[in-house]
UniProtKB/Swiss-Prot annotation:
It comes from Bacillus subtilis (strain 168). This is SPbeta prophage-derived uncharacterized HTH-type transcriptional regulator YopS. InterPro entries: Cro/C1-type_HTH (IPR001387), Lambda_DNA-bd_dom_sf (IPR010982). Residues 22-41 bind DNA. The lineage of its organism: Bacteria, Bacillati, Bacillota, Bacilli, Bacillales. Gene3D superfamilies: lambda repressor-like DNA-binding domains. Residues 11-66 form the HTH cro/C1-type domain. The gene is yopS. GO terms for molecular function: DNA binding.
Length: 74
């Protein structure tokens, strides 16, 4: 069995690297600022693949770069 734990959200760090704000990311992706904030605070962690792809495309990264992940194989 494979267990995946979601760690820290890396969206703010990726925004800093691209020199854009969360507000700008919201405008680029069409995702509400509050929703992006919820992902960052881990209030929401199960974002849809479409949402993850939109954020990743805007930040020029891969979907798996949006969060730290811990994968355990049992």
């Amino acid at each position: 069995m494979i267990k995946v734990e979601i760690g820290q959200c890396l969206i703010p760090e990726l925004c800093r690297k691209k020199d854009i704000t969360i507000n700008e990311l919201s405008e680029i992706t069409g995702i509400k600022k509050q929703q992006l904030s919820d992902y960052n605070r881990l209030v929401k962690v199960d974002m849809s693949i479409r949402t993850a792809k939109r954020i990743a495309a805007a930040l020029d990264c891969n979907v798996e770069d949006l969060y730290e992940f811990k994968v355990e194989r049992h």
